Amino acid sequence: MSISILKDKKLLIGICGSISSVGISSYLLYFKSFFKEIRVVMTKTAEDLIPAHTVSYFCDHVYSEHGENGKRHSHVEIGRWADIYCIIPATANILGQTANGVAMNLVATTVLAHPHNTIFFPNMNDLMWNKTVVSRNIEQLRKDGHIVIEPVEIMAFEIATGTRKPNRGLITPDKALLAIEKGFKERTKHPSLT
């Protein structure tokens, strides 16, 4: 696959505390050859599932909630650095925060500081996904010009119940890349989407 429109772009990925965050390395490795540089910003709950140190092997830099050497990260600098900001996986919590302008962590504050729209890749179980409040938050994000790529139906192991069952999951890295490219092209065609 050759997506030359992205080759000189800087991609920022926000990682939230969904269990699917443990598979983020496959997305980072896949995206690596299509972007100039990839950086990651993580919530504390994401770091509880996969340490920032581990994620750093698959990208150019990781920003974590606690900062570096006692110094907090600037969400403004992080947001301005990125040409494209995606949140993979996006939890119901981050959808709710950002839809309502609430910024309780570095991932959410960076959405507010990023000069363009953000692309959200939600991942949660069916019970959460089908809640009216989640639908309302997604609708608000879209009204605000953000892009929400819906999860797909898959057979998945549900940790909460310890069973395999039909559920929701992230789209594959190759399809995620196509969604990012499409979102970027739309933004360049319609600057009002920023």
From Swiss-Prot:
GO function terms (MF aspect): FMN binding; oxidoreductase activity; phosphopantothenoylcysteine decarboxylase activity
Cross-referenced SUPFAM superfamilies: Homo-oligomeric flavin-containing Cys decarboxylases, HFCD
Domain of life of the source: Bacteria
Pfam family, one: Flavoprotein
Biological or metabolic pathway of the protein: Antibiotic biosynthesis; mersacidin biosynthesis
Disulfide-bond pairs as recorded: none
Cofactor note: Binds 1 FAD per subunit.
InterPro entries cross-referenced by the UniProt entry: Flavin_trans-like (IPR036551), Flavoprotein (IPR003382)
Catalytic machinery residues: 75
Keywords annotated in UniProt: FAD, Flavoprotein, Lyase
Listed GO CC annotations: phosphopantothenoylcysteine decarboxylase complex
GO BP term (any one): antibiotic biosynthetic process
Known function: Catalyzes the oxidative decarboxylation of the C-terminal cysteine residue of mersacidin to an aminoenethiol residue.
Similarity comment text for this entry: Belongs to the HFCD (homooligomeric flavin containing Cys decarboxylase) superfamily.
Assembly and oligomerization: Homododecamer.
The protein's name in its UniProt record: Mersacidin decarboxylase
Protein species of origin: Bacillus sp. (strain HIL-Y85/54728)
Gene this protein is translated from: mrsD
